[in-house]
């Protein structure tokens, strides 16, 4: 099957596919319409010349290369494409003498398919060799990174740095060239991100090595921390380079990304549970412990972390973990309630507490088992990939030693482990059957090589057979691992809501559990937010979560019984929709408040840690102060990460912002202990310049990452909501200051004033970012003026707070401080108003009465009513032709996933009128064409021309959507929205080109009996996946274009009308 993950492959395959499509149409005209096929000598000669040139270049490459795999895989591709070319030439010759020849038509269609398939194989084989060149450079850097462990002198460090630099530069250049060549946008981003991380870590590595060498040679304290810093940086760089190697080998969508994320999430959850378990059990053992204190919070956090693991599991494992979490949560509520009523020492309370304690042990064991199973399957999967890679090199070398057989045996052993962990017996048996076949073939090949017959035709054929069988085995084990995981919901809130809505609308349709998984994900985030809330707010949010859970279970039960379309199900669906809306609103309100509190000040704890680390050696309680500030910094960093994750989960962010937040949270978690280690080295080596520079490097890296995280969190939540929450928080801080002054508590006053100043500065930061993001001069001017006014009010308030703290009973000072506080509040309100421009009054106010002029003249007489027939009423506006989506007819064979993707795009576009909006018109047209393609792709004879033409029409509409979206982006004043729109719409041309190529491939197979079911199904699968990607990209483009149109330039000549067919409030 053709793959086109690079621009070069795509640019070569597209014209070939275009030529082949003409031949396919001629074939169908001859076969179905009985037309004579015209003389094909000239077009076939053109194809033959292009293919011959490609083969010649390929053969020259094989002659000069040292890549054994390339030498092995190129010749079969040459043979395939040359045989296909021969068939085409024979067909042209036969048709010259007989334009109606049936054998000639068969040669024509088989040759066409062979040309496309063979050319693709040839290009892919060559591309794989290019990738191996880059991987060799990457592996060279990986090997050299391990040398860092033996560098113990400054001379060695200088040499190491000099040697590492050129290799890093070469790798960076190759990766940059490769990412520009890739057609998959996600793969490009992954490569760029990993390479950027490696570049950022290089100075950190040199700094860590330098401090290690310094402390080791001077025999100072802190050598253990220096060693940790160095090893962490080496491991982090190695992990990123390994990720680069993995992504370089991807040719289609990324199937492995979830595995490492899930394993990592489970390990982190397990570590968090272990760290909280003693504190939780201590609270349960103590009948006098207060409800709501750190011990109870530890239990809530354990249940939260275990719930995250449960969501990553499937089937019975998932039900058991989540069920245990819910039960323990309810029992903890009961224990807390009894203690709040003073009955903590009662037999009932003591028994409940003991049951919770035992339940926590059971839950921890379940979580450990789940983590162990996923890690075992993931490790086996990764091990199989490495061993098969090594085995392929052995299979390509006729004189290879016995180590290759060992690699194959190792891969088979790992595959057996996956088979044993499979829940599906059919999958397990399929893998085990493949193991037996590969073992027998490998044994036979090994015997031939030991007899010195490794270069014989039989041995070479066997080697090729084993290579193919190993690739098939890898596909089967990958699928088994993927199927063992639950259905994956979208990573962002709007995506989850959309998936949930689709299931609610059609609960009987099999969506592989995605809709229910999305609802579970939303409910899980609701529980997470509730865990940090207090009293009635917490109970209210939990009640909303339980309501959604109950309604989902009831609707799923009705759907399972075949009653998903019944009136009862419709009523339930309506209730569930309303409950989801309520839950979403309350979650976003809670999350915005938490962001306002936690992100009001991100850097003070690390600055205080820096002060403690540089304290003079004779400072009192130097170590104790440092330990306290290190713990505060660690807790603060953890809170930032947890809150950022909530903002990502329930904010208004798109997928790329969510992934950006997740990446920055991961980096913060990794960096925090390294910053503390660097600070401890500085504490134990006062005055050491190398230690100071190293700490500054680590500190700045942490601060840069948190600033990036803060910016992404601000993108993820509504700016006005954040400003509202900050304004309310400042009011509460002012109220606390009033209480402090009334009770003569200067420290409480200072804390309140400090909080006000931090929140005001946070608002300034948000406003500054929005000004930088906008190109609307009026908006920029208004926000900047309001920000400047706010900026001027902060310092006077701080000065007044210091004055009143020094003499808290002075009424005059108290009044000055409160006046300053109210001035800040007023300035904050003006910033908020700048983000919410006043809407014009509707209806407009009446005219000024003073402008009225009365005269003595009489009004003219009223004209008579028209006589005769009453004119007919105005006819209703004509219905838009593209409104109705075609329903599947009884007995009609269609491709269901393709039809569903088309329907989803049509549903999105139908929200808007296509009058005056060419993007909507083109999107609806594409959806209807894709619905037609879902029928053609399953058709028999007589549909080749229609399939090819349909793909061309879809590509034409795609070009129209892309062109219009770029016009909208050009006029949009919001840089973020513009970038999002361009990123989405720029995917469309590549995908639509691929659709044309894949449709041509599929057309060559329609009605043919000499094609295997597996090959035909593979072609359909690729076409379906491409269609789904295209429909999704256009759907996202429609949404982003609508968002961009709100921020369009007022003087823009280009406009699109966005008129909702169904208003949002209905």
Curated annotation (Swiss-Prot):
InterPro entries in the cross-refs: Alpha-catenin/vinculin-like_sf (IPR036723), Vinculin (IPR017997), Vinculin/catenin (IPR006077), Vinculin_CS (IPR000633)
Record GO biological process: adherens junction assembly; apical junction assembly; axon extension; cell adhesion; epithelial cell-cell adhesion; lamellipodium assembly; morphogenesis of an epithelium; protein localization to cell surface
Modified residues (Phosphotyrosine): 537, 822, 1065
Comp. bias regions, Pro residues: 860-876
Subcellular location: Cell membrane; Cell junction, Adherens junction; Cell junction, Focal adhesion; Cytoplasm, Cytoskeleton
Keywords: Acetylation, Actin-binding, Cell adhesion, Cell junction, Cell membrane, Cell projection, Cytoplasm, Cytoskeleton, Lipoprotein, Membrane, Palmitate, Phosphoprotein, Repeat
PROSITE patterns hit by this protein: VINCULIN_1 (PS00663), VINCULIN_2 (PS00664)
Residues bearing PTM Phosphoserine: 97, 260, 272, 275, 290, 346, 434, 574, 579, 600, 721, 795, 809
Region annotation (3 X 112 AA tandem repeats) ranges: 259-589
Topology within the bilayer: Peripheral membrane protein
Ranges for region Talin-interaction: 168-208
Modified residues (Phosphothreonine): 604, 672
Residues modified as N6-acetyllysine: 173, 496
Post-translational modification: Phosphorylated; on serines, threonines and tyrosines. Phosphorylation on Tyr-1065 in activated platelets affects head-tail interactions and cell spreading but has no effect on actin binding nor on localization to focal adhesion plaques.
Gene3D superfamilies for the chain: Alpha-catenin/vinculin-like (1.20.120.230), Vinculin, Vh2 four-helix bundle (1.20.120.810)
Gene Ontology molecular function, alphabetical: actin filament binding; alpha-catenin binding; dystroglycan binding; structural molecule activity; ubiquitin protein ligase binding
GO cellular component: actin cytoskeleton; adherens junction; brush border; cell projection; cell-cell junction; costamere; cytoplasm; fascia adherens
Region (Facilitates phospholipid membrane insertion): 935-978, 1052-1066
Domain comment quoted from the record: Exists in at least two conformations. When in the closed, 'inactive' conformation, extensive interactions between the head and tail domains prevent detectable binding to most of its ligands. It takes on an 'active' conformation after cooperative and simultaneous binding of two different ligands. This activation involves displacement of the head-tail interactions and leads to a significant accumulation of ternary complexes. The active form then binds a number of proteins that have both signaling and structural roles that are essential for cell adhesion.
Family (UniProt): Belongs to the vinculin/alpha-catenin family.
Family annotation (PANTHER family): VINCULIN
Function: Actin filament (F-actin)-binding protein involved in cell-matrix adhesion and cell-cell adhesion. Regulates cell-surface E-cadherin expression and potentiates mechanosensing by the E-cadherin complex. May also play important roles in cell morphology and locomotion.
Listed name of the protein: Vinculin
Source taxonomy: Eukaryota, Metazoa, Chordata, Craniata, Vertebrata
